[in-house]
Regions:
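Bacterial Sec-dependent N-terminal signal peptides
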Residues: 1-50
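Intrinsically disordered or highly flexible coil/loop and linker segments, enriched in small
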Residues: 39, 90, 94, 98-105, ...
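N-terminal helix-rich structural modules
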Residues: 46, 51-256, 684
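C-terminal, non-catalytic "cap/extension" segments appended to globular domains
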Residues: 52-75, 80, 87, 268-270, ...
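Short His/Asp/Glu-rich catalytic/ion-coordination signatures at enzyme active sites or charged loops
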Residues: 65-80, 129-148, 171-212, 272-312, ...
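Short, hydrophobic/amphipathic alpha-helical patches that form generic packing surfaces
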Residues: 121-131, 193, 296, 390-398, ...
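Active-site-proximal, well-structured secondary-structure segments within enzyme catalytic domains
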Residues: 187, 219, 226, 231-271, ...
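Short pre-active-site segment immediately N-terminal to the catalytic Zn-binding motif
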Residues: 505-521
């Protein structure tokens, strides 16, 4: 993966924009470098006289006066982004030229640190732009993103293939690597390896071709980023009468009415399609034909059936990536992409997956058989269970066996209580953190909230933004990212945000969550903690800037706190009465967490294998767009995961993690890091899950360290284990 594409699209659950490789932080030399004109992007009338005007300073190019250096969204306009990007690119080019033209011998300080600092302004500006491009993509923001992408990719190419710059980096690596210690040594290694991995050792035609590929992939991913959200928005299922929504709660029906109103009211009600294959609403819909319509809208959203077709983009991206791998001396893209991960090779990942598939398959078959038998007992012996029936009869089966349903527990999962009395409370108990809402700090959308994060001694350590509710301008999924990464060298505290896609209740009503949405909030805040608790010297090494197959560990581990009784009891309170969840309901609900979990494992295994199947192909074998769907079927069949009842969590045509995000040949990392998370959760349970000293040890040995050391050693230092224990995964899922 090219450096810039990873910067812009590397999502956490998906979850984007977390790795700043060549784009770093703030410098002071704007005006002295002749950039004053770029900062004056619009004009305003002065009070002095008619016809007079004074330049308006671009707020993106000015150091923020807000606490923590937070973005001042009161001042930023959509028209500010491109002039700011252009000025910041110009500044980084000047900084790189200064490094190259330095007459002194290359040193760690005048080359490596200087390079780490060279993109500071561009990092600040692009972090804000790409945050909005994912979470509040108005037409103006979409246009700014479209214009920015080719400029940024061209900059990346110019830096990566700047032979004079790389020679200085290589000189430092060759002459100072042995003498440097700690984070200095790690930064040198990371900078050198990133240049090499991006193609700096290539020359001639190979280097030129790789630059062409980088530019083309950036363009294709921009097209994907426009097309898929549009396709998903158009996949909305319109419903003419309330009777068709039988089975939904009144709150869910009100949400369907509100969704229809926000999308033009083509019918009184609308069912919005989310990013995954299966749609949670199918668990409640009594109308089988409507269930079918919703499911088909999901799986056909972007395969050409309904006018939106991403397969041409998929085929070209896959072929170009395969060529990237070959140019870099590997047999395919996956082998190239995995070089600097914990897994190392596709073969290691396939061995890991086959171990899981072997244990999973009989459990999945038994689970499917049980649901089929239940459905036939309900509907008749000739009833044929379809994928759109799965959630519905599974929910009914759970209701019969455990006497529990989502509608029964949702009133106890008010989004505000889950966040403040659950997510924040767990962080307080485990890490000593406190959260103070800052209503004085502006946001890019009125639904957002901002919190100052304070350590146990009351000292501010981070700023945290929360953007919980779905809207037409927000892409699907949930993620963590940052406006600024932590760095002691820059004296910068982290500015972190979480984005989710929960339904916002009509005015005057509480916004309620499903259990899955509750765990999503804990998951994303696990990523946030990785950034909030970072205590690293250099920006490039801090927070979540770690290997993909490690980055999901803190988030998946943090999910474990959602069901710990002391935490659960603190947030699971009725949204109207404030009373805690009754003991019998709580017992039934917690027992239901692992009910029929073979499905969730199977859909993730299928998606993971799809991702790998596309990226282990040599360029000559990548299928054309018209053969892409057939390739998906063949790939799943060969690995033993072609299951009509358990489709991939993301099918090829809407697999945003892979084609629009930073998880190409990397979706396996969710399962890989789930093993790490299970092992760590076991350690917490044995030592005392809510004991501050246990949390402090995890904070000191893992969360605070970013990418400053060997990741496996961090894991081992905390757990005492030499290697992760994959056998713990299936039991942890109740399988």
């Amino acid at each position: 993966m090219s450096i810039l594409i990873r910067i812009i699209n590397y999502s956490l659950s998906l979850r984007p924009n977390i790795v700043n490789t060549i784009i770093m932080k703030i410098t002071k030399a704007l005006l002295t470098l002749g950039l004053a004109s770029a900062m004056m992007q619009s004009t305003a009338q002065t009070a002095g006289g008619a016809g007079m005007s004074e330049p308006r300073q671009n707020p993106l190019l000015m150091k923020s006066t807000l606490p923590f250096g937070a973005p001042d969204f009161r001042k930023i306009q959509s028209s500010d982004y491109i002039p700011a990007i252009e000025a910041a690119i110009h500044l980084q080019r000047s900084k790189v030229a200064d490094i190259v033209n330095n007459k002194q011998a290359p040193t760690f300080q005048n080359t490596i640190v200087a390079f780490d600092e060279s993109g500071a302004l561009l990092g600040r500006v692009s972090n804000i732009l790409f945050a909005l491009a994912s979470a509040d993509k108005t037409p103006e923001i979409a246009e700014a993103e479209k214009q920015a992408m080719p400029m940024l990719t061209a900059l990346e190419n110019d830096i990566v293939f700047n032979k004079a710059l790389f020679q200085r980096v290589k000189y430092v690596y060759d002459h100072q690597h042995r003498s440097l210690k700690g984070e200095d040594k790690k930064l040198l290694e990371e900078v050198y390896q990133k240049f090499v991995h991006a193609g700096a050792l290539l020359s001639g035609e190979k280097a030129s071709r790789l630059q062409e590929i980088n530019l083309r992939i950036a363009d294709l991913q921009q097209q994907w980023g426009d097309l898929l959200p549009d396709a998903t928005n158009h996949a909305v299922v319109w419903v003419d009468s309330k009777d068709e929504l039988a089975g939904l709660s009144e709150a869910d029906i009100a949400q369907c009415r509100q969704d229809a109103e926000s999308r033009g009211s083509k019918a009184p009600y609308a069912i919005v399609i989310i990013n995954t294959t299966q749609q949670p609403i199918l668990a409640s819909l009594d109308n089988r034909d409507l269930r079918r319509r919703v499911y088909e809208a999901s799986i056909h959203r972007s395969d050409g059936t309904r006018g939106f077709n991403t397969f041409p983009l998929v085929a070209e991206i896959a072929k170009l990536r395969a060529e990237q791998g070959e140019l870099m001396g590997q047999k395919n893209y996956a082998s190239y992409s995995l070089e600097n991960t914990m897994a190392k090779t596709p073969e290691n990942i396939y061995a890991f997956l086959r171990q899981l598939i072997q244990g999973y398959t009989p459990k999945a078959d038994a689970e499917t058989k049980a649901i089929e038998e239940f459905a036939r007992r309900t509907e008749g012996s000739d009833f044929k269970l379809e994928p759109y029936d799965r959630f519905y009869y599974s929910a009914k089966m759970k209701k019969e066996m455990l006497n529990i349903s989502d509608d029964e527990v949702k009133p106890y999962f008010n989004v505000d209580s889950v966040q403040k009395n659950g997510v924040f409370y767990a962080a307080h108990r485990v890490y000593g953190l406190n959260f103070v809402e800052r209503k004085d700090i502006p946001t890019y959308h009125p639904d957002m909230k901002v919190f100052e994060v304070q350590d146990r001694d009351g000292k501010p350590i981070a700023l945290f933004y929360s953007d919980m509710f779905r809207r037409p301008t927000k892409r699907g999924g949930a993620w963590m990212s940052e406006f600024a990464k932590q760095s002691t060298y820059r004296q910068q505290l982290p500015i972190i945000y979480n984005v989710c896609n929960s339904a916002k209740a009509p005015a005057g009503q509480p916004s309620l969550l499903t259990w899955d949405e509750v765990t999503t909030m804990f998951h994303e805040f696990g990523h946030a903690l990785h950034g909030i608790l970072s205590n690293c010297k250099y920006n490039m090494l801090s927070g979540t800037d770690v290997a993909r197959d490690f980055v999901e560990m803190p988030s998946q581990f943090n999910e474990s706190f959602a069901s710990i009784p002391e935490i659960f009891d603190h947030y699971a309170k009725h949204a109207v009465t404030g009373k805690p969840m009754p003991a019998d309901l709580k017992e039934r609900m917690l027992k239901s967490i692992n009910f029929q979990t073979a499905y969730s494992l199977g859909e993730n295994l299928a998606a993971t294998c799809l991702d790998l199947a596309w990226h282990v192909l040599p360029s000559k074998d990548v299928p054309t767009a018209d053969k892409a769907a057939d390739f998906e079927t063949k790939a799943l069949k060969e690995i033993g995961l072609l299951n009509h009842q358990i489709p991939p969590r993301y099918s090829t045509s809407y697999f945003n993690h892979v084609w629009g995000g930073g998880y190409a040949a990397g979706y396996y990392s969710y399962l890989w890091t789930e093993v790490l998370a299970v092992n760590i959760a076991d350690c917490f349970a044995k030592r005392g899950a809510l004991k501050p000293e246990v949390g402090q040890a995890f904070r000191d040995k893992v969360l605070s360290r970013g990418n400053t050391g060997d990741l496996m050693k961090m894991f081992s230092d905390f757990t005492g284990m030499k290697q992760p224990d994959a056998s713990a995964l299936l039991p942890a899922r109740g399988l």
